[in-house]
Amino acid sequence: MEKRIANIIYSSRWLMFPVYIGLAFGFVLLTVKFFQQIICVIPEILTMSESGLVLIVLSLIDIALVGGLLVMVMFSGYENFIAKMETTENKKRLSWMGTMDVNSIKNKVASSIVAISSVHLLRLFMDADKISDNKIMWCVVIHLTFVLSAFGMAYIDKMSKKHYS
Protein backbone atom coordinates (compact mmCIF):
# COMPACT_ATOMS: atom_id res chain seq x y z
CA MET A 1 0.00 0.00 0.00
CA GLU A 2 2.80 2.39 0.94
CA LYS A 3 4.62 1.71 -2.34
CA ARG A 4 1.41 2.39 -4.32
CA ILE A 5 0.92 5.73 -2.55
CA ALA A 6 4.55 6.64 -3.23
CA ASN A 7 4.07 5.80 -6.93
CA ILE A 8 0.92 7.92 -7.12
CA ILE A 9 2.66 10.86 -5.47
CA TYR A 10 5.70 10.44 -7.73
CA SER A 11 3.50 10.27 -10.83
CA SER A 12 1.64 13.41 -9.78
CA ARG A 13 4.66 15.44 -10.90
CA TRP A 14 3.20 15.16 -14.41
CA LEU A 15 0.41 17.49 -13.28
CA MET A 16 3.01 20.25 -13.74
CA PHE A 17 3.22 19.47 -17.47
CA PRO A 18 0.13 21.52 -18.45
CA VAL A 19 1.49 24.38 -16.37
CA TYR A 20 4.70 24.41 -18.42
CA ILE A 21 2.65 24.20 -21.64
CA GLY A 22 0.69 27.22 -20.39
CA LEU A 23 3.95 29.08 -19.77
CA ALA A 24 5.04 28.24 -23.32
CA PHE A 25 1.77 29.71 -24.57
CA GLY A 26 2.43 32.80 -22.44
CA PHE A 27 5.82 33.06 -24.14
CA VAL A 28 4.10 32.95 -27.55
CA LEU A 29 1.81 35.79 -26.43
CA LEU A 30 4.83 37.81 -25.26
CA THR A 31 6.50 37.27 -28.63
CA VAL A 32 3.38 38.51 -30.42
CA LYS A 33 3.32 41.61 -28.18
CA PHE A 34 7.04 42.19 -28.85
CA PHE A 35 6.57 42.24 -32.61
CA GLN A 36 3.35 44.24 -32.32
CA GLN A 37 5.33 47.00 -30.61
CA ILE A 38 7.99 46.92 -33.31
CA ILE A 39 5.40 47.05 -36.10
CA CYS A 40 3.55 49.94 -34.41
CA VAL A 41 6.72 52.02 -34.00
CA ILE A 42 7.95 51.66 -37.61
CA PRO A 43 5.56 54.23 -39.17
CA GLU A 44 6.36 56.75 -36.42
CA ILE A 45 10.13 56.24 -36.19
CA LEU A 46 11.10 59.34 -38.20
CA THR A 47 8.84 61.67 -36.22
CA MET A 48 9.25 60.06 -32.81
CA SER A 49 11.23 61.82 -30.09
CA GLU A 50 14.38 60.20 -28.79
CA SER A 51 12.83 59.70 -25.35
CA GLY A 52 9.79 58.09 -26.98
CA LEU A 53 12.06 55.66 -28.80
CA VAL A 54 13.95 54.92 -25.58
CA LEU A 55 10.63 54.10 -23.89
CA ILE A 56 9.75 51.68 -26.70
CA VAL A 57 13.18 50.03 -26.48
CA LEU A 58 12.82 49.73 -22.69
CA SER A 59 9.46 48.10 -23.25
CA LEU A 60 11.09 45.61 -25.65
CA ILE A 61 13.83 44.91 -23.10
CA ASP A 62 11.16 44.36 -20.47
CA ILE A 63 9.42 41.80 -22.69
CA ALA A 64 12.76 40.07 -23.44
CA LEU A 65 13.57 39.80 -19.72
CA VAL A 66 10.15 38.33 -18.93
CA GLY A 67 10.56 35.93 -21.87
CA GLY A 68 13.96 34.82 -20.60
CA LEU A 69 12.47 34.29 -17.17
CA LEU A 70 9.70 32.15 -18.68
CA VAL A 71 12.18 30.02 -20.63
CA MET A 72 14.35 29.51 -17.56
CA VAL A 73 11.39 28.51 -15.39
CA MET A 74 9.94 26.21 -18.08
CA PHE A 75 13.18 24.41 -18.87
CA SER A 76 14.61 24.08 -15.39
CA GLY A 77 11.23 23.31 -13.83
CA TYR A 78 10.55 20.59 -16.39
CA GLU A 79 13.99 19.06 -15.85
CA ASN A 80 13.83 19.32 -12.05
CA PHE A 81 10.29 18.08 -11.55
CA ILE A 82 9.19 16.03 -14.56
CA ALA A 83 11.95 14.48 -16.68
CA LYS A 84 15.25 15.24 -18.36
CA MET A 85 14.80 16.99 -21.70
CA GLU A 86 16.19 14.92 -24.51
CA THR A 87 17.12 16.85 -27.62
CA THR A 88 17.82 15.26 -30.98
CA GLU A 89 21.34 16.62 -30.95
CA ASN A 90 23.29 17.04 -27.72
CA LYS A 91 25.01 20.15 -29.06
CA LYS A 92 21.62 21.91 -29.15
CA ARG A 93 21.28 21.41 -25.40
CA LEU A 94 21.79 24.62 -23.43
CA SER A 95 24.82 24.45 -21.16
CA TRP A 96 22.92 25.36 -17.99
CA MET A 97 20.19 22.74 -18.45
CA GLY A 98 20.26 20.08 -15.80
CA THR A 99 22.62 22.07 -13.59
CA MET A 100 20.15 24.34 -11.80
CA ASP A 101 18.68 23.19 -8.51
CA VAL A 102 15.63 24.77 -6.90
CA ASN A 103 17.70 27.32 -4.94
CA SER A 104 19.62 28.50 -8.00
CA ILE A 105 16.32 28.80 -9.89
CA LYS A 106 14.89 30.92 -7.06
CA ASN A 107 17.96 33.17 -7.12
CA LYS A 108 17.82 33.55 -10.90
CA VAL A 109 14.09 34.31 -10.76
CA ALA A 110 14.71 36.90 -8.03
CA SER A 111 17.50 38.48 -10.10
CA SER A 112 15.25 38.55 -13.15
CA ILE A 113 12.45 40.18 -11.18
CA VAL A 114 14.88 42.86 -9.97
CA ALA A 115 16.03 43.46 -13.56
CA ILE A 116 12.44 43.67 -14.82
CA SER A 117 11.54 46.02 -11.98
CA SER A 118 14.59 48.16 -12.79
CA VAL A 119 13.51 48.52 -16.41
CA HIS A 120 9.97 49.37 -15.31
CA LEU A 121 11.31 51.98 -12.88
CA LEU A 122 13.50 53.49 -15.59
CA ARG A 123 10.45 53.76 -17.85
CA LEU A 124 8.61 55.56 -15.05
CA PHE A 125 11.50 57.97 -14.55
CA MET A 126 11.51 58.73 -18.27
CA ASP A 127 7.87 59.87 -17.93
CA ALA A 128 8.22 61.30 -14.41
CA ASP A 129 6.54 64.58 -15.35
CA LYS A 130 3.32 62.67 -16.18
CA ILE A 131 3.31 60.42 -13.10
CA SER A 132 2.42 61.34 -9.53
CA ASP A 133 5.18 61.45 -6.94
CA ASN A 134 3.20 59.03 -4.81
CA LYS A 135 3.16 56.40 -7.58
CA ILE A 136 6.89 56.83 -8.19
CA MET A 137 7.59 56.53 -4.46
CA TRP A 138 5.60 53.29 -4.22
CA CYS A 139 7.31 51.86 -7.29
CA VAL A 140 10.71 52.63 -5.73
CA VAL A 141 9.61 51.03 -2.43
CA ILE A 142 8.40 47.92 -4.27
CA HIS A 143 11.64 47.78 -6.28
CA LEU A 144 13.73 48.05 -3.11
CA THR A 145 11.64 45.25 -1.61
CA PHE A 146 12.50 43.07 -4.62
CA VAL A 147 16.19 43.97 -4.27
CA LEU A 148 16.26 43.20 -0.54
CA SER A 149 14.37 39.94 -1.10
CA ALA A 150 16.86 38.87 -3.79
CA PHE A 151 19.80 39.67 -1.51
CA GLY A 152 18.10 37.86 1.38
CA MET A 153 17.45 34.73 -0.67
CA ALA A 154 21.02 34.72 -2.00
CA TYR A 155 22.39 35.16 1.52
CA ILE A 156 20.24 32.35 2.92
CA ASP A 157 21.30 30.09 0.03
CA LYS A 158 24.96 30.91 0.65
CA MET A 159 24.64 30.24 4.38
CA SER A 160 22.82 26.95 3.84
CA LYS A 161 25.49 25.78 1.38
CA LYS A 162 28.21 26.74 3.85
CA HIS A 163 26.37 24.98 6.70
CA TYR A 164 25.79 21.74 4.77
CA SER A 165 29.23 21.62 3.12
Curated annotation (Swiss-Prot):
Pfam families cross-referenced by the UniProt entry: UPF0114
Family stated for the protein in its record: Belongs to the UPF0114 family.
NCBIfam families tied to this protein: HI0507
Compartments (UniProt record): Cell membrane
Segments traversing the membrane: 15-35, 53-73, 136-156
Topological category with respect to the lipid bilayer: Multi-pass membrane protein
Protein name from the UniProt record: UPF0114 protein in repA1-repA2 intergenic region
Keyword entries, A-Z: Cell membrane, Membrane, Plasmid, Transmembrane, Transmembrane helix
Organism this protein belongs to: Buchnera aphidicola subsp. Thelaxes suberi
GO cellular component, one term: plasma membrane
InterPro entries: UPF0114, UPF0114_bac
Major localization listed first in the record, in broad terms: membrane
